[in-house]
Regions:
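Short, glycine-biased loop/turn motifs at secondary-structure junctions and
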Residues: 1-258
Length: 258
């Protein structure tokens, strides 16, 4: 299964790394994944919160412990070993689950709730909920839910849901759903779905679906589908593929757009 949060229970400790792949855990520890070792050395477990990642801050006694293998060693005691798993996951949670304060992450996956503020760099991934603030740079990835506010620079991909607000710069790619609000600048690319609202500036590119609303400025380009609404200003261009129609900016000529 390898769900969050996966651990490997050994007789003398619980291995609970940043990742959730049991196979990767066994390889890191140099343990063969075979019947002999499964019956004597390790137990794969999944320790999951009641509502997946939305409830990572719930008390650990509400989480569910599942064994992810058919045979277990004789020393395995689900009640006693659950306590060991809880202790290991609590240590992991303190490092990866934020409910307040300002945090800087450069690698791995973290989860932000409440009024936490996260600055993500390099290959870090942030899943943000509630009213959290995320500023992402480099190759970081952001998944925004609730009323999260995200500011992205460079190649950061963002998926925005609920009432999330995103400001995207550089070559950022944004997928917006529900009532998410996006402001896109530079060469940012946005796909807007549901009732998402987008304001596109500079050379931003937008694909709008459903009831999405887009305001396009400068030389932004918008492709509009379904009943999406677009207001275009300056030299922005709107393309309606389903209607085979293009609305050119005022003063547009072949010479000025070659």
């Amino acid at each position: 299964m390898c769900q969050l949060k996966s651990c490997l229970v050994l007789k003398d400790r619980v291995f609970c790394p940043d990742y959730n792949s049991h196979q990767q855990m066994l390889e890191e520890l140099g343990i063969e994944d075979d019947y002999l070792h499964a019956s004597k050395t390790f137990v794969r477990v999944e320790f999951t919160p009641p509502d997946n990642t939305k409830s990572l801050i719930e008390p650990l006694d509400r989480w569910t412990l599942e064994v992810d293998q058919d045979i277990v060693p004789e020393w395995w005691d689900k009640k006693a070993d659950r306590q060991r798993v809880e202790e290991a996951v609590e240590i992991w949670r303190k490092r990866h689950v934020f409910t307040g304060g300002k945090h800087i992450v450069t690698t791995g996956t973290v989860y932000a709730y409440g009024d936490a503020e996260v600055h993500a760099y390099n290959d870090a991934t942030v899943a943000a909920y509630d009213s959290t603030i995320v500023k992402a740079y480099g190759n970081a990835k952001v998944y925004a839910f609730g009323k999260t506010t995200v500011e992205t620079v460079s190649n950061v991909p963002v998926e925005a849901y609920g009432d999330a607000t995103v400001k995207a710069y550089g070559n950022t790619k944004v997928e917006a759903f529900d009532r998410a609000i996006v402001k896109a600048y530079s060469n940012a690319k946005v796909e807007a779905n549901g009732s998402a609202t987008v304001k596109a500036f500079n050379s931003a590119t937008v694909k709008a679906h459903g009831n999405a609303k887009v305001e396009a400025f400068d030389i932004a380009i918008v492709k509009a589908f379904d009943i999406a609404t677009v207001k275009a200003y300056n030299r922005a261009m709107v393309i309606y593929p389903e209607e085979r129609k293009i609305i050119y900016p005022a003063g547009w000529t072949i010479e000025t757009h070659e």
